[in-house]
């Protein structure tokens, strides 16, 4: 902000000491420091507010650009839908006359539909697909073990006793 070197600061201090005197100099220095700090804080606040306003301006501009792009996409989709809807309505109203562009070549395939069959349409393939679906929805055993709620809870000691071989167990005595 101000280009004050060490020599300039010393010169200002000596002049202030001569003009103000040693009694009033500390109080004036404190007041000047406080005012200087307030000025710096005020300047920093103004800078922050200006940058915030600039960022808000940029965000508003970006928002308006995105809204314009969204409306352009929406209008193009609506126009496209209206065009295809009118084509389909014309084809529906005309009855038998269907344009090949709308049908996608389906008119040519209608004559061949009885002659060709889907390769996987045999009964064995149907059963295989059914088994595949069953396997697809089956839950893995590791997942069942990890997520199911235990109904038979055992303590650690009971579990050890259960899985310890008979030769390693202590003999039980009954009176």
Curated annotation (Swiss-Prot):
Superkingdom per UniProt: Bacteria
Region of interest (Disordered), residue spans: 104-132, 155-175
Q: Which GO terms describe its cellular component?
A: TAT protein transport complex
Q: Please give the chief subcellular localization of this protein.
A: membrane
Q: Which GO terms describe its biological process?
A: protein transport by the Tat complex
- Which Pfam families does the record associate with it? TatA_B_E
| Annotated family | Belongs to the TatB family.
Protein known as: Sec-independent protein translocase protein TatB
Organism name:
Paraburkholderia xenovorans (strain LB400)
């Amino acid at each position: 902000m101000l280009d004050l070197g060490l020599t300039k600061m010393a010169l200002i201090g000596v002049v202030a000491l001569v003009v103000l005197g040693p009694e009033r100099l500390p109080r004036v220095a404190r007041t000047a420091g406080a005012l200087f700090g307030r000025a710096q804080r005020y300047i920093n606040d103004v800078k922050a507010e200006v940058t915030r306003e600039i960022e808000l301006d940029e965000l508003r501009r970006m928002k308006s650009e995105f809204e314009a792009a969204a409306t352009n996409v929406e209008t193009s989709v609506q126009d496209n839908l209206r065009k295809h809807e009118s084509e389909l309505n014309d084809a529906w109203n005309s009855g038998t006359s269907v344009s090949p562009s709308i049908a996608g070549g389906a008119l040519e395939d209608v004559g061949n539909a009885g002659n060709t069959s889907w390769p996987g349409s045999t009964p064995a393939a149907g059963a295989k697909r059914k088994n595949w679906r069953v396997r697809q929805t089956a839950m893995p055993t590791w997942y069942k073990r990890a997520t199911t709620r235990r109904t038979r809870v055992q303590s650690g000691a009971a579990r050890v006793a259960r899985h310890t071989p008979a030769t390693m167990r202590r003999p039980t005595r009954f009176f």
